[in-house]
From Swiss-Prot:
<keyword id="KW-0368">Histidine biosynthesis</keyword>
<dbReference type="GO" id="GO:0005737">
    <property type="term" value="C:cytoplasm"/>
</dbReference>
<dbReference type="InterPro" id="IPR038494">
    <property type="entry name" value="IGPD_sf"/>
</dbReference>
<dbReference type="InterPro" id="IPR020565">
    <property type="entry name" value="ImidazoleglycerP_deHydtase_CS"/>
</dbReference>
<dbReference type="GO" id="GO:0004424">
    <property type="term" value="F:imidazoleglycerol-phosphate dehydratase activity"/>
</dbReference>
<comment type="pathway">
    <text>Amino-acid biosynthesis; L-histidine biosynthesis; L-histidine from 5-phospho-alpha-D-ribose 1-diphosphate: step 6/9.</text>
</comment>
<dbReference type="Pfam" id="PF00475">
    <property type="entry name" value="IGPD"/>
</dbReference>
<dbReference type="InterPro" id="IPR020568">
    <property type="entry name" value="Ribosomal_Su5_D2-typ_SF"/>
</dbReference>
<keyword id="KW-0456">Lyase</keyword>
<keyword id="KW-0028">Amino-acid biosynthesis</keyword>
<dbReference type="GO" id="GO:0000105">
    <property type="term" value="P:L-histidine biosynthetic process"/>
</dbReference>
<comment type="similarity">
    <text>Belongs to the imidazoleglycerol-phosphate dehydratase family.</text>
</comment>
<protein>
    <recommendedName>
        <fullName>Imidazoleglycerol-phosphate dehydratase</fullName>
        <ecNumber>4.2.1.19</ecNumber>
    </recommendedName>
</protein>
<keyword id="KW-0963">Cytoplasm</keyword>
<dbReference type="InterPro" id="IPR000807">
    <property type="entry name" value="ImidazoleglycerolP_deHydtase"/>
</dbReference>
Length: 196
């Protein structure tokens, strides 16, 4: 199998990001964004996906974490799409239900080439998590889905603790990505012959 890897850089007035990704890795992850909770969530995602991931971001966290989180999601999604290449042979669809203490999240996705996000249950999250508004994480998932060109459904099913809910979501996303990216065949899994 061809090595499925990509490197992405992005520099704006808000963030400077450097990212390298190997899809079929060993779960070796190094993330430094200047926002500890983001580092924690992206480390979980990469580990559970089995990615080798190195991501550094110098963002305008003196404002808040919004641009850092949003751009990290976009770059990670772009790297994932690039690493998969023509997507021939992948399972394409993946899902996972992951508990974290009292919280349970379900993640379902399709590497369809048609970006879309459904994010349900976010009313369970407290208004502020790790010093930032809870809606910040919707922006991450939206940016990731757009960059990766995937149809992504995340359902926070139940739970009380915002950290636990998000941790189960990021672990679930990683596991669902691992399953969807698995090579199971030679042909492209599409009756129309295209994933766009």
């Amino acid at each position: 199998m061809t090595r499925r890897a990509a490197t992405v850089t992005r520099t704006t007035t808000e963030t400077a990001i450097s990212l390298s990704l190997t899809v079929d890795g060993k779960g070796e992850v190094s993330v430094t964004t200047g926002h500890g909770f983001t580092d924690h969530m992206l480390t979980l995602l990469g580990f559970w996906a089995g990615f080798d991931l190195t991501l550094t971001c110098n963002g305008d966290t003196h404002v808040d974490a919004h641009h850092t989180v949003e751009d990290a999601g976009l770059c990670l999604g772009q790297a994932f799409a690039q690493a998969l290449g023509d997507r021939k042979g992948i399972a394409r669809v993946g899902n996972a239900r992951v508990p974290m203490d009292e919280a349970l999240t379900e993640v379902d996705l399709d590497i369809s080439g048609r970006p879309y996000l459904v994010y349900r249950g976010d009313e369970l999250l407290p208004p502020v998590i790790a010093g930032d508004e809870a809606d910040l994480w919707r922006e991450f998932f939206k940016s990731f889905a757009n960059g990766a060109r995937i149809n992504l459904h995340i359902s926070l099913l139940y739970g009380k603790n915002g950290h636990h809910l998000l941790e189960s979501a990021f672990k679930g996303l990683g596991l669902a990505l691992r399953r969807a990216a698995a090579c199971e065949r030679e042909a492209l899994l599409s009756t129309k012959g295209s994933l766009d």
